[in-house]
C-alpha cells in the first residue's frame, strides 16, 4: 500500500538539460500539510519551447536546514508552433492497483513506453478505480490513498517522474461507473470527486478542454467527457449531451 504522508518542506530546481551555462531556477521551500495530502505542486512559467528540462526535488523536515531526500526527473516542453520536428507520443487508459500485471513493480506498459521514450504521454482516464475493492474508495481519504498507492509503484513512478504527461479523467477516477453530476458514491459527491481530480491531483488549464500544439504538424485535442454530461437516465433528445453546451460550441468553432 501507500506510505503515510508526513509534514515537511520541499522545493523544486529545474534547468535545461543541454544548456550547461543556463541558470538553474529554484522555487521557494513549500510546506506539505495534511490538507493537501502532504503533497506539493508548482506552476512553472517562462519555459523554453522544444526543450528537455532536468528536475531536482529536494525535501527536508519542517524547520530544518538539512536536505534529507532528493528525487531527480525531467520533462519535455512542446516545440514552438512553427517548428517542424519529429516526435513520438504514447497513449494509455484504464488501469488500477489490484490489476497490475507485473506484481508490485506496477504495469508492464511503463517499461515498454520507457524504451520508446516518447515526447509526451496522454493518459485518457480511469487511472484508478474508486469503485473496485481493496479498498472501495467511499471517502475522499480512501480516494487519496488509492492515488498515492498507484503512483508509488516503482515502474509507474519511474516513468512519470521523467516524462511530460497529460491526464484526462473518466468515470471510475471521478466517482464511480457511468457517473454524472449530482450523484454520490459513499460519502463523496460527484462535485467533490471532480474537485479532487481537477484541482488537487491533476490541475491544468481552465477550462480543461483545450487544444495543444506540438510544433507545426501536430495539434492534440483534449475533451472533458464527465463534468458537463447529462444523466444517462435522461430521455434521448437534442438536449441530452456528453460535452455540455459551452464545450460543444467551442468544439464546433
Kindly give the residue locations of the regions a language model identified.
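Metal-dependent phosphoester/phosphodiester hydrolase catalytic core
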Residues: 1-253
Amino acid at each position: 500500500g501507500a506510505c503515510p504522508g508526513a509534514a515537511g518542506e520541499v522545493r523544486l530546481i529545474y534547468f535545461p538539460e543541454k544548456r550547461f551555462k543556463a541558470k538553474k531556477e529554484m522555487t521557494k521551500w513549500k510546506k506539505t500539510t495534511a490538507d493537501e495530502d502532504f503533497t506539493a505542486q508548482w506552476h512553472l512559467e517562462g519555459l523554453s519551447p522544444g526543450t528537455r528540462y532536468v528536475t531536482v526535488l529536494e525535501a527536508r523536515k519542517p524547520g530544518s536546514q538539512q536536505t534529507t531526500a532528493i528525487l531527480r526527473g525531467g520533462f519535455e516542453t512542446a516545440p514552438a508552433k512553427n517548428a517542424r520536428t519529429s516526435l513520438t507520443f504514447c497513449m494509455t487508459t484504464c488501469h488500477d492497483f489490484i490489476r497490475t500485471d507485473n506484481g508490485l513493480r506496477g504495469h508492464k506498459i511503463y517499461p515498454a513506453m520507457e524504451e520508446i521514450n516518447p515526447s509526451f504521454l496522454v493518459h485518457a482516464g480511469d487511472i484508478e478505480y474508486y469503485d473496485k475493492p481493496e479498498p472501495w474508495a467511499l471517502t475522499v481519504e480512501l480516494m487519496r490513498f488509492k492515488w498515492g498507492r498507484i503512483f508509488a509503484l516503482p515502474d509507474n513512478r519511474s516513468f512519470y517522474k521523467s516524462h511530460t504527461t497529460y491526464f484526462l479523467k473518466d468515470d471510475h477516477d471521478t466517482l464511480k461507473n457511468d457517473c454524472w453530476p449530482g450523484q454520490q458514491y459513499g460519502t463523496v459527491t460527484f462535485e467533490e470527486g471532480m474537485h479532487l481530480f481537477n484541482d488537487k491531483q491533476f490541475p491544468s488549464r481552465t477550462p480543461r478542454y483545450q487544444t495543444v500544439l506540438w510544433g507545426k504538424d501536430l495539434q492534440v485535442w483534449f475533451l472533458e467527457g464527465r463534468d458537463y454530461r447529462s444523466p444517462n437516465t435522461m430521455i434521448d433528445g437534442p438536449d441530452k449531451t456528453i460535452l455540455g453546451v459551452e464545450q460543444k460550441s467551442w468544439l464546433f468553432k
